[in-house]
């Protein structure tokens, strides 16, 4: 994930290069176009891909994602596939202070979204809006395996009450998808593209 901080720097966290998952942090100074790798401390998130990150003030908030290790791969190839997938999908929230580069854990009450990756999160006032993603649970309309599916969940995280709740809306909602993009403009959430697994 990549986020603009203060208009002059871009912070990159985590990702996957096709072989390895990462949880490192890099900073690009946009004024001199120079990369640096700051020394971070605190309880850092585990390596992951497909996570979301948003900036709230000077805090970088990271949610969800997906990771796989050798042990999970062995399980997924056998009778423990379901439990292996359960361990791979993430739902934690970590916060990085972009001034001190110290990680901390964040706990939010209410009914949190299912573990997922490929979703989007956007800031709208004091609310964080979450939509879609690829998850291991039931309830979505499109599946390619019994334990995995894209979804059309719309969740709201209130930073005032530090709690999750399911979003309510009228009209025709977007279809289930992951890998899409979204942005909040005023009272509107714009969603574009994505993948249902059956089609883009």
Model-predicted segments: where are they?
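Kelch-like beta-propeller repeat domains
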Residues: 1-200
């Amino acid at each position: 994930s990549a986020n603009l901080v203060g208009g002059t720097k871009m912070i990159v966290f985590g990702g996957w290069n096709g072989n390895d998952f990462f949880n490192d942090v890099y900073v690009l100074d946009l004024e001199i176009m120079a990369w640096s790798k700051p020394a971070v401390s605190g309880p850092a998130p585990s390596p992951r891909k497909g996570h979301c990150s948003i900036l709230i003030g000077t805090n970088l908030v990271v949610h969800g994602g997906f990771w796989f290790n050798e042990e999970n791969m062995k399980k997924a190839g056998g009778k423990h596939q379901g439990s292996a997938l359960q361990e791979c999908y993430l739902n934690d929230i970590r916060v990085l202070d972009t001034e001190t580069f110290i990680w901390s854990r964040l706990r939010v009450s209410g009914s949190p979204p299912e573990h997922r990756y490929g979703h989007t999160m956007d800031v709208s006032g004091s609310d964080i809006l979450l939509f879609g993603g690829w998850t291991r649970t039931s309830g979505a309309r499109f599946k390619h395996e019994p334990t995995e599916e894209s979804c059309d969940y719309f969740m709201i995280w209130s930073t005032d009450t530090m709690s999750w709740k399911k979003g309510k809306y009228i009209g025709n909602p977007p279809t289930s998808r992951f890998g899409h993009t979204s942005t909040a403009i005023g009272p509107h959430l714009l969603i574009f593209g994505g993948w249902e697994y059956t089609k883009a």
